[in-house]
Amino acid sequence: MTRFVTGGAGFIGANYLFYLRGHYPDDRLVCIDKLTYAGNLSTLAPLLGQPNFRFARVDICDREAVYGLFEDERPDVVVNFAAESHVDRSIADPSLFLQTNIIGTSVLMDACRKYGNVRFHQVSTDEVYGDLPLDRPDLLFTEQTPLHTSSPYSSSKAAADLLAGAYGRTYGLPVTISRCSNNYGPYQFPEKLIPLMIVNALADRPLPVYGRGLNVRDWLYVGDHCRAIDLVVNHGRIGEVYNIGGHNEMRNIDIVRLICRKLGKPESLITYVADRQGHDLRYAIDPAKIHAELGWLPETRFADGIGRTIDWYLANRPWWEEIVSGEYQTYYARMYGDRPMA
């Protein structure tokens, strides 16, 4: 089988490629990635040079290049991780998010139609549902929750989801969609909360927390997410949406304090900064459907997963030190350097 993984040099995509190689050693894997700031070719070093692995530096919006890859490789399945995914960046400049997340997805699905009605899986986010109140812990996102986006990022992902559903209904494309809660684990770019706090704490730098840090997120270890996607791709019902959640709800401030404790760093490093515009209060996913239909449940408790993640960043300093030494510093200064205190 030939599998296309778009966005495979990014955090979740790379972990998914490693998962596939471990479980399907004879399959041909083709990684398609534009190598934006969040894509890192060094992450894929264990796969590069393998005879049944190909890396293609291609923008999914480049129709000619995408069609050329389909012509060469004739994939059996496409799993689309390729996306601009950081909410703050989408607020600063929505245009790239609309282009990559919507137009890029349509180009991929057009290629799937053109080259044999290829199986297509769209990786999405719980952010398409909006947010939940902090005082109603009984409320969870289900697959029936209406789409109610809060940011240009989540709006672009919701549009891509709707487009995928439309391609399934209009053209008969075999499509599935998964929507996950917040991921964490190895190889995550340090603009996201957990790796940002780990990297800053290790350097004794301020730990910027939006508002008072009371926003709640449901945390999903990336390995559990990869296993869930594999089940949906292989056994999910065509045309269906599957929510993937970690059953690990935590306030942002509690995560930051936990990281400080595990690294032996003082909480005085925590710096409260002005809140994000339209900051969602709480995300929490009900994974009952994927459990009932496919037998999936998260296996990684947050206490174990965060320890594993911290250990990885401690053991792989060269990977993240290279990232934080370049263009990222300019972005970091723009996002946090001039932000007023909360």
Regions inferred by a protein language model and the residue ranges of each:
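Short histidine/acidic/glycine/proline-rich micro-motifs that form metal-
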Residues: 35, 182-185, 215-216, 276-277
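Residues that form or flank phosphate/diphosphate-binding pockets in enzymes
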Residues: 12, 38-39, 64, 188, ...
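Hydrophobic alpha-helix immediately C-terminal to the catalytic Tyr-X-X-X-Lys motif of short-chain
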Residues: 159, 163, 167, 197, ...
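Short aromatic-enriched loop/helix-cap "lid" or pocket-rim segments at secondary-structure transitions
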Residues: 41-44, 132-135, 188-191, 255-256, ...
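N-terminal Rossmann-like NAD(P)+-binding domain of SDR-like oxidoreductases, especially those catalyzing
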Residues: 1-183, 308, 313-316, 322, ...
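C-terminal substrate-binding subdomain of Rossmann-fold SDR/epimerase-dehydratase oxidoreductases
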Residues: 3-4, 58, 195, 201-342
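Active-site helix-initiating loop/hinge in glycosyltransferases
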Residues: 185, 189, 218-221
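A glycine/serine/threonine-rich, flexible loop-to-helix segment
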Residues: 47, 135-136, 190-198, 274
